[in-house]
Amino acid sequence: MSDRIYHSYVNNFYQKAKSPKNTQLIKQIQRSNPTSPKKNLQIYKNINPFNHENCQRIIEENAIRFSDKKTVQLGTVYGCNILLTTKNSQPKVFEKLIQLSDNSNFRQVTLLKSISPVSVVKAKDFLNDSISNRSRSAQKMYSDKDKFQVGNNKSSLRSLIYFPLANIKDQISEESKSKRNKIKVIKDMPIQLDNSFQTINHQINSPNNNIVGDQSHVILHNIFKKRQQAEEGLQIQEEPQNYIKNKLELQERKMYLENQNPKSLSPIKIHFNEKSMPFKNKIQKKITYNEQSSIQQTITLIKKKILGPPSLYSRLKKNSEQFKNIENLIKNKAKESHEQNMQEYLKRIGCTDKNKKVFCINSQDQFVQEVLIELGWIENKLFKSDLFHLKWIYTDINKDYENLKEGQFYNHFQNNQELTNKGRLLRNIKLYLVSYPHLQKYFPIQFDVIYKQQKEEFLNEFQKFEIFRKFKDVIQIIKNDLTQELINQLTQIYHTKFIKKEEEEELQYGLITYFRQNQQFKQYIEYINQVNKDIINLLSKIPNPNINEMLIKYLNDLSILQVDKLECDQEQGDKNIQAQIINLSISIELDNILEQIYPYTNFCNFWIIKPCGSSKGQGLQIMSDDNQIVNYTTQLQARLVQKYIERIYICKSQEYPQLYNKKFDLRLWVLVKSFNPLTVYYYKHAYLRVCSSEYDLSDTRNIFSHFTNYSINRNKFIQNKNVEDSAISLKLLKHIIKKEHGISYQKKIQPQINEIIIHSLKSVQKKIKQNNSCFEIYGFDIIFDEQFNPYLLEVNLSPACSKRNEFISKLQKEMFISTLNILFNTEYYQIQNWKKIKIQDQIQKVINESTHTQLQEEVILNSNNFQSEDSEERFISAAITIQKWYRQIKLMKNENQKI
C-alpha cells in the first residue's frame, strides 16, 4: 500500500470518526457477512478508532445491547484496537488471549476465532487489563504494511485489527509524505539523545499511555512501518536544546548505552540545526551511531557535545577528580535552578516568605489538603505543574516521573502495579518463594487460573483438599466416640510400632478388647481404609501434589501397613483387629499432621475468587465447587483463586461487643521511602476492619459476614447506626490477646508481620524503579488464624480510606503529619508514629533458614515452572512400587495355596 493511498484512507477514517453513527455501524456489522478482507475493510473503515475512554463510553451507551452476550466485544490489545463479533459463543476467552500474547509471532491472530463475547460489566475489566498486557511482538505485525485485516474468513468470526490513528491534518508534516520517507519528529514530543526503536516502543506500550493520542499516528506510521528500512538509519531532526536542556540526564544516557547490546540498537543519526548551535564551529555537526561503532565511542561523542571542545574534554578526562567535581556542579546547578524557580513562583503569587512550601494535589484524600493548608503550605492548583515541593496524586502516570528534581517528593513509585495488582503480586511472590520456600506459611494458597499450568495446579489442590475433607469428617466421628485415653494410646502405638514389639502388644491389648465390644467401629475402619486408598491413588496421579515432608512418613507407613493387612486377611481374629488398630493409629496421626500443616483451614474446601484489577471488594465470591469455580473464572474477569482462611480468630468474649463473633482483618500502613536501598516504616497505630454481621461459615453467601471491605458493609453499618464499629483501633486487639490468651502482640505477632512486609517488598524490588524523589504508602491487609499466625491477603495502592468515623479521620491526619516529618526532616506537632523496620536482620534470618542454592533458583526461574521438591516425586514412585509388590506377594501366596 503506497503512502498516498494510505494517507487518503486515514483521512477518510478520521473525518468520519466523530460522527454519531456507531450504533448503526455496529448493527450493519452484525447483519453483514463479509466474504473477503477487502469487503471487511469497506465496512469497518468508518468506525471510530476507539481510545480507552471512547471504548468505555460506547460500552455504556450500548449496555442493553451488549448484555445479551451474543453481539459485540470491544477492547484494546497489544497497541491495536480490536472489535470482535461472532455468532456462536465459545468458552476459554482469556486463555486464548494469553496463548496469543505468549506467542512470538503476532500474525497468528486466527486464534481469536474461538473467542466469545463477554458481558458489559466485564468488558470494562477486559479493556483495562488488555491495555497493560501488550506484547512487544506487536511490532512484527506493524512491520507488515498490507495486513490491516486479520482473521479467518471461513469462520463465523469477523474481526478487525487496525492501526490507532490520530488527527493527520495537524500532525503529519509535508516531509513525511515525500518520497524520501524521512521521519520528522513533532516538536511537542521530546526525543532524548539515547532514543531508539526499543525506547519508542516502550513509550507506545506504556500502560498509562493513551494509544490514540497526538503522537501515536506519527510514531506508528513513521517508525513501525519503516522498521524494514532500518539499514538506512532513522534520521531525527531536533533542536539541540531539547536534549541538552537538562545536563543531569548525562548519567542516565551513559547507563542506558552501557547496558545495551550494540547489535540490538537501531542506527541513530542526529542532525543539528547549524544556526541554533550553541557551540563553536570546531565541533562536529553530526553524530552517527551504527552497528560497527562501539558504545564507548558514542558516549565519548555525547560528552564532547555537552562538555565542550575536544581539547577541554581531553584535559578533564585526565583529571578524574576534576571531572567528578564538574558532575557535582551540574547536580548542584539543577538543584539551585529548582529553588530559584520556586522562589520566582512565590514572588509571582505575592508570597514574601521564601521558605514557604508548595504542594499539588489531585486525589480523594481530603485530609492531605486540610493538613497542608493548616501547616501553612501553599497549593498550586495546576496539579500538572513542575512547581511544587510535594505532589500527591491518586493514580500515577509515567510522565509524572520524567522531570522530578532533588527537593521534590512524589507519592508514588514507577511500576508500583507489581506490588498492588493482585495478579502481578502473586507471580512475584511465587518466584520469590522458589528461593525461600519456608516463607509460604505467610501466604495463602493462591492460583491465577488464566494460565493453563496454574489452572491444573488449582484442580489438583482442590482434589487434595476434597479427599482430606472426607477423611476429617470420619476421623472426627471416631474421635467423638473414643475417650482421650484411647486416643493417646493410639498415638503412642503409632510412634512405637515396628520398634519394640513387646510394648506394642501390651498397648494393643486394651484396644483389642475395646474393639471387640464395639462392633460399629468396623464400619468406621472400613470407611477409613477406603479413604486411605483414595488418598494414595489420588496423590499418585497428581504430577505435583505439593506434599509436605511430614506427610511422607505417614503415607509410607500406610503403604507398609498393607503388607500386614494382606497377611491378616488370611487369618481372622486378633491379628486382623491388630492391623485395624495400627491403621487407625496412623489415621489419627494424619489428623494431627494436617492440623499442623494447614492451621488456617478446617477442610471445608472454600475458595475465594478475586478479580485482578478490582478494588473495594468488587467481584469477590466464595465457592466450594471446582466446576463452578472454573466456569466463573473463565467467563468473567475474576482470575485469582485463593484458599479461604476458614479457621480465623474470632473473639468469643461478650465483653467486647465491637468484635464479638465478627470477622475482622488488619489494615496496616507501610511507608516505603526507598526501594534501593530498601527503607521501610510501618505505622504503629493500625486499625481493624470489621464485618457488619456475625461470622457464619455455613452461610458463605452472606457477604456482610465474610468481607471486611467498608464499601461492602457501609450501608449495613449506616442502617444499624453503628458506623463507629466499622474501624477499631489495634490497641483493643492487643488487649484482648494479652488478657484472654496471655500472648504479647509485640513479641509474637509483630515480628511475623515485619517478615511479611519485607519479603513482599523484596519480591518486587528489582521491578520497581528507584527514584530518590519518590515515596509511597501501601495498605497491607493481614488476617489471623486461631493460633494468631498472620497471612497476607493483598497490598493496596493509595490506601488512605475515605472518611467514615472520627477515629479514622484523626488517624489519617496524624499519619500524614508523621510522613511529612520523615520526608522533610521536620517536627510538625512533635508527631512521629512511623517505626522503621530493621531490614538486614530480617533478610539474614531468611538466608540462614533457606536451603535452596543460587543455582537451583536460576534453574527454576529459567524454566518458569514451579515444580515440587524431588523428595515428593521419589515418595510417589516408591509408594506405587510398594503397592505393586503387595499384589505380587498376594498372587504368589494364592498360587502356593492352590498347589
From Swiss-Prot:
GO BP annotations listed: protein polyglycylation
Main location: cytoplasm
EC number: 6.3.2.-
UniProt note: phenotype after gene disruption: Cells lacking TTLL3A, TTLL3B, TTLL3C, TTLL3D, TTLL3E and TTLL3F display shortened axonemes that are resistant to paclitaxel, indicating that tubulin glycylation changes the lattice properties of axonemal microtubules. Axonemes are however normal at the ultrastructural level.
Amino acids binding ATP: 642-645, 663, 665
Enzyme class: ligase
Function: Probable glycylase which modifies tubulin, generating side chains of glycine on the gamma-carboxyl groups of specific glutamate residues within the C-terminal tail of tubulin.
Protein name: Tubulin glycylase 3F
Cytoplasm listed as a keyword: yes
One cellular component term from this protein's GO annotations in UniProt: microtubule cytoskeleton
Listed GO MF terms: ATP binding; protein-glycine ligase activity; protein-glycine ligase activity, initiating
Domain TTL: 471-835
InterPro entries: TTL/TTLL_fam, TTLL_monoglycylase
UniProt gene name: TTLL3F
Keywords: ATP-binding, Cell projection, Cilium, Cytoplasm, Cytoskeleton, Ligase, Nucleotide-binding
Localization (cell): Cytoplasm, Cytoskeleton, Cilium basal body
